[in-house]
Amino acid sequence: MLDENEIKENLKSLDGWVLRNSILYKKFSFKTFMNAFSFMNIIADHSEKIDHHPKLINGYNVVEIELYTHSSNSITKKDFLLAEFIDNIYEEIFSQ
């Protein structure tokens, strides 16, 4: 569990992520629905492997992501690690 100062400090290293209602949040845009859905599938596969599941919201070519650790009822380091993974996948594959 991270305190408020640790959360704010960790947010500085993430591009575009914000704290919204005590949840890490970011919106991603894509050229097509298929790209958006492929992005969600990559995240879902990785999330299963690490047993840490984000909330994914899809509307055509937009994916909104909310990260929160339910077991600790707070934001934890796991959320920031998953946010980094998500950002890396987006930059490597979908940011064109």
Predicted regions and their residues:
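A short N-terminal helical cap/helix-turn-helix that marks the beginning
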Residues: S47, D51-I57, F85-Q96
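Short, well-ordered beta-strand elements within core beta-sheets of diverse protein domains
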Residues: I23-K31
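Solvent-exposed alpha-helix faces
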Residues: N41-A44, E84
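Helix N-cap motif at beta-to-alpha junctions
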Residues: T32-F33, S72
